[in-house]
Design a protein with these regions (language model features):
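Short, well-formed alpha-helical segments that are part of the catalytic scaffolds
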Residues: 12-26
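Short beta-strand/loop segment that forms part of the nucleotide-sugar
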Residues: 31-39, 60-65, 89-90
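Acidic donor-binding/catalytic loop of UDP-sugar-dependent glycosyltransferases
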Residues: 43, 92-105
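Glycine-rich, basic loop-to-helix element that forms the pyrophosphate-binding segment
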Residues: 64-80
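Short aromatic/hydrophobic "clamp" motif used to bind/position activated sugar donors
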Residues: 85
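Conserved nucleotide-sugar donor-binding catalytic segment
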Residues: 149-185
Length: 185
């Protein structure tokens, strides 16, 4: 079993998806990367297929009619085989140093006797051409340890957890029957 499945929803992503995929590939055989071509009209599907051909033990491609971001995520969940699951949008990428630390921590936790349902990390929202980066921080959550929701306390107004900052235990998502609405982001 792979350590983590990354689902990458792709819609007309040909111009920028390479950067996303290349950063995810640095995990090597620990990762399963599912590229969901959500009915793209450009070369997204061809690019995705080329990655699957070049990295057959890591990359899988699913071509589907356009169902929107939510349906692409649902497709990823239904097809994920990794112990953990994360969505990375095709116009996003991972910071390699942070990525290595997260993978090391997931390896460490997965070898223990406790079950981890969610792994939360800070997320940087960086828009091309904008000078200031917005860092989404979960500052009131305990750091560097496993904790319960009771320990997490309450979130402050304007504070929330983005899907982009969470890694889920795949089995949890499957067992709870998570289904995102079609055509939503």
């Amino acid at each position: 079993m792979k350590l983590i499945t990354f689902t990458v929803p792709c819609y007309n992503s040909a111009a920028y998806m390479d950067h996303c995929i290349e950063t995810l590939l640095t995990a090597g055989e620990d990762a399963e990367i599912i590229l969901v071509d959500d009915g793209s009209k450009d070369d997204t599907g061809k690019i995705a297929d080329a990655y699957a051909e070049k990295y057959p033990t890591i990359v899988r491609v699913i071509h589907q009619e356009n169902g929107g971001h939510g349906e692409a995520v649902n497709t990823g969940i239904r097809n994920a085989t990794g112990l953990y699951f994360k969505v990375v949008d095709s116009d996003d990428w991972v910071d390699l140093d942070a990525y290595r630390k997260i993978l090391d921590k997931l390896r460490e936790i997965s070898g223990g006797d406790r079950v981890l349902d969610m792994f939360i990390a800070n997320y940087v929202y960086e828009k091309e051409g904008v000078k200031h980066k917005k860092v989404m921080r979960c500052s009131n959550l305990p750091k560097d340890r496993i904790f319960t929701w009771k320990e997490a306390g309450h979130f402050h107004k304007g504070q929330y957890i983005l899907m982009h900052s969470v890694i889920y235990r795949t089995k949890l998502l499957v067992e709870c029957g998570l289904e995102l609405p079609k055509h939503t982001f």
